[in-house]
Amino acid sequence: MPTRKSRLFPDLKPQNEHERFMLEAIKEAEKAIDKNECPIGCVIVKDGRVFVRAHNLRLTKGNAICHAEVTAIDKACRKMGDFRLNDCDMYVTLEPCTMCAGAIIQSRIRKVYFGAYEPKSGAVCSCNDIFNVIHGHNHKVEYEGGLLEEQCAAMMKDFFKNIRIRDSKKD
């Protein structure tokens, strides 16, 4: 069954299953853009299918923890009736922050695939290495970064460029 195309990247054709799922996360990020939210999208995959979708909702909900990853984990746990998501993988457009990395560990996500690296606050490998430094948990999260990195980074860059342009017009 064909899915709708990305609005920002209509010619993007996924080369494999991982790119296909990241494209779904990109579509979620586009929903965030429509709400003037930071363009971060996330999908959790279970049994080779998208299980839940989420995007940033911090401004919309007025809640600092409504990051795409935390919202997706919450949806998946409610849908499964369990906090253990060990047979699930996460695809997110930006390297998770410390809070989200902690939630990923606690929910026992099997593997995280992220798009753009986050040099200012990325907690998977850019600024911190949360998946490898938190001890005392019986779960180790695997990860792979840089999946459709160019597109994911472009969304972030364009979003913040547009904010600067908008803010400069206020002066």
Language model features with spans:
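Residues that line or immediately flank small-molecule/substrate-binding pockets and catalytic motifs
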Residues: R58, V92, A116
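Short beta->alpha transition motifs characteristic of CBS
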Residues: F51-R58
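Zinc-dependent deaminase
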Residues: M1-I33, M99-D171
